[in-house]
Amino acid sequence: MNERKGVHKIMAYNTLTEREAFYCLCHVPGFGSATIGKLRERFGTYQEVWTAKEQEIQKAGVLTEKRVTVFLQAREQESAWLKEFYGLERTGIRFIAEGDTDYPERFLPYKDRPAALFVKGNLPENEVPAVAIVGARACTEYGKEAAGFYAGELANAGV
């Protein structure tokens, strides 16, 4: 067990599916597509990344010591994230991960493509021009209003 301040006991994270582990990794502060991809490359599966011991994570050489600490602390949010994951369907939101059959092909050529998308509604066909509003899950009230305004204007314009 790590004795550094702020790092709590390491729980037994071994019952998650690959998809659940990936969803949780997408929520770790500072983890983007590149970091998650490098970790998966080193460990083989998202489950192995999620359940890795601190020494294994450090040895992988992907994360700085500070980011290892952030990751270990973030794993304590697992149950909240899983509750959110299983609540998405009720709100009409789909979690689409790279590799899923409905992940947009138009993103595949890009190196910095999103690892996952949260989609409400239907995605357009790959040949159809489209606009997406991308933002933070914890945006300000102004951010919500601005996104809503632009989404409405674009929809009214037939985009």
Feature map (PLM): residue ranges:
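Short, positively charged patches
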Residues: 4-152, 156
